[in-house]
Amino acid sequence: MDPNTVSSFQDILLRMSKMQLESSSEDLNGMITQFESLKLYRDSLGEAVMRMGDLHSLQNRNEKWREQLGQKFEEIRWLIEEVRHKLKITENSFEQITFMQALHLLLEVEQEIRTFSFQLI
């Protein structure tokens, strides 16, 4: 994984964990959990691409990996919409910066996962 992406994930997760949104901390905790899950999934796809022979073991281990890939893209789209919504309603500049960075990271990770998945297909 690109060191910049790792630090971006860590920075955003740290910032989000410090935020107290007016709406609900449960919403934010859910977003943080999904960000962490997305990071792990992205890492595993990247590692599979690095080990070219891993495609067969990936397919053998889990025949539904394409379905999982589709679910991850749905999660990314949902997270993008949630982040955009939070960005629109927040007036706190710290939160705005955090959500802008999170949105940028989500779009970047979506593109990376697409690239990895095309290499695996």
From Swiss-Prot:
GO biological process: exit of virus from host cell nucleus through nuclear pore
Pfam families: Flu_NS2
GO cellular component terms, A-Z: host cell nucleus; virion component
Renumbered ranges of motif Nuclear export signal: 12-21, 85-94
Domain of life: Viruses
InterPro entries in UniProt: Flu_NS2
Location(s), subcellular: Virion; Host nucleus
UniProt keyword list: Host nucleus, Host-virus interaction, Transport, Virion
Quaternary structure annotation from Swiss-Prot or TrEMBL: Interacts with protein M1. May interact with host nucleoporin RAB/HRB and exportin XPO1/CRM1.
Primary role: Mediates the nuclear export of encapsidated genomic RNAs (ribonucleoproteins, RNPs). Acts as an adapter between viral RNPs complexes and the nuclear export machinery of the cell. Possesses no intrinsic RNA-binding activity, but includes a C-terminal M1-binding domain. This domain is believed to allow recognition of RNPs bound to the protein M1.
Note: Average number present in a viral particle is estimated to be 130-200 molecules.
Homology family: Belongs to the influenza viruses NEP family.
Name listed for the protein in its UniProt record: Nuclear export protein
